[in-house]
Each structure stands twice: as structure tokens, then as C-alpha cells.
Amino acid sequence: MRLDQRAQSDMRKIQLETDVNKHAEGSVLISVGDTRVLCTATVEEKVPPFLRGKRHGWINAEYAMLPRATAQRTGREAVRGKQTGRTMEIQRLISRALRSVVNLEKLGERTVWIDCDVLQADGGTRTAAITGGFLALVLAVDGLIQSGKLTDTPIKEGIAAVSVGKVGTELLLDLCYEEDAAADVDLNLVMTSSGKIVELQATGEEATFSRKEMLDMLELGEKGIEELLHAAEQSLGASWWYVGEEVEHK
């Protein structure tokens, strides 16, 4: 039995609150257990210089942790004037993941910024940011369609992310901080609603792992992805119709 009494294959409680920021074109507060991440989507009617005139959109993400997101205060990176390598890696991961399920030509010459701010960290912040960031993106696309700026959805399918790990001899789904810190093997899985893998990060922190363990961890992760996407569909309601659908604005 785990620290929080979950079974090995159990996700933590998933909570999704939409439209939590009145200024953003899309906003979601995602909670997975005690990890809480605020994700907002901002639409800019311009693209980076390398895409100008190409009738092609762009999606970019930024990620940050509030000073007291963790047990001990961590100073703001903006004050230090430099982002850590971890932050830059996570931002690139979120950006790649979201672009993988969007037809950027259909998005048009506009940029969608996804800002992910960790309010409270208890393991799995990057995976929660990907899932919450995608939902904020869907809400922003909903607004673009309702306003007539888009006539059909650029979103090809859903996407979510989850952590899996090996702690001792046990394979665990959705690790909390204590489990993550004790993990011998750490795996982050980003997967689409059709079961395609977008990103797989698997690292033997303190031990190696077998091919069978790798496949077993993937199976656990896929179960978690399905639960996250089901929760997302329930939370977004009618907006979920813009995920993987060719829709005409009427």
C-alpha cells in the first residue's frame, strides 16, 4: 500500500476547474492530488518572425513555480535573471507536446501562448502542466471559432501526460513527491487520445530496468492517460467537440 493508501495502478484525485481567469482566452486550474497548476492560454494575432507570411500558426509555452509551491521557498527565476535548465526543458516539452496535436496551418497566422504556473508541487508538475495546458488551448480555440476567427478546429486529437515510476520492486502510477524522490526509475509519458506516444522520458535514476518493466510502465501510463482524458471531456463539456472534429461555425 502506498503512502496515500492508493493501489499501484491508481491515479490521485483529478480536479479540473475551467475559466478561472477572466482575462485569458482559455484557463484551467488542474489539480492532481496535491499538485495544482494554473494554465492560461493567450491568443496573439501574430507569429514569430520565422513564420511571417507562411500562413502558419505557432504554440509556445512558459512554465514557472511560485516561490512557495514547494516545502521550502524557492526564489523567483525572474529575480535571478536566468531560467534553470529544468525550467527550459519543461517549457520545450510542453510546447512540443501541444504542437503535436494541432494543425498549425489551420490555426492561421497567430500564436497561442500557454502559461503554466505551479501553485503547489507534489510530484508530476510537468505532466499536469501538459494536460492542463491542452485544456486551456481547447477553450481558446472554442473562443476563436465562436468569434468567427476560425471556421474549423485545428486540434487533431486530445493529449494528456502522466508519470510512472519504479520504487523498490513496485511499479507505481502517478507518483507523489515522496514516491518520486525515492524512485529508482522515473518515466513521464505523453500520449494522444488515439494511443499514440508523443513523448517518452524514462530514466534509471538508481537502477536499470528491463524491457518487460518498460512495457508494464507504459501500460500503467496508458491507463492514467485514459482517466485524465475522460476527466477532461467531462470538464470541458461542449468545448470538447472541438477536439479532433471538423466543425463549421454557424
Swiss-Prot record:
Function description: Phosphorolytic 3'-5' exoribonuclease that plays an important role in tRNA 3'-end maturation. Removes nucleotide residues following the 3'-CCA terminus of tRNAs; can also add nucleotides to the ends of RNA molecules by using nucleoside diphosphates as substrates, but this may not be physiologically important. Probably plays a role in initiation of 16S rRNA degradation (leading to ribosome degradation) during starvation.
Keyword set includes RNA-binding: yes
Presence of the UniProt keyword Ribosomal protein in the record: no
Keywords on record: Nucleotidyltransferase, RNA-binding, rRNA processing, Transferase, tRNA processing, tRNA-binding
Assembly, per entry: Homohexameric ring arranged as a trimer of dimers.
Catalysed reactions, as listed in the record: tRNA(n+1) + phosphate = tRNA(n) + a ribonucleoside 5'-diphosphate
One BP term from GO: rRNA processing
EC top class named in words: transferase
HAMAP family named among the record's database cross-references: RNase_PH
Molecular function per GO: 3'-5'-RNA exonuclease activity; tRNA binding; tRNA nucleotidyltransferase activity
Binding site for phosphate: 86, 124-126
Family of this protein: Belongs to the RNase PH family.
EC number: 2.7.7.56
Pfam families the record matches: RNase_PH (PF01138), RNase_PH_C (PF03725)
Full protein name: Ribonuclease PH
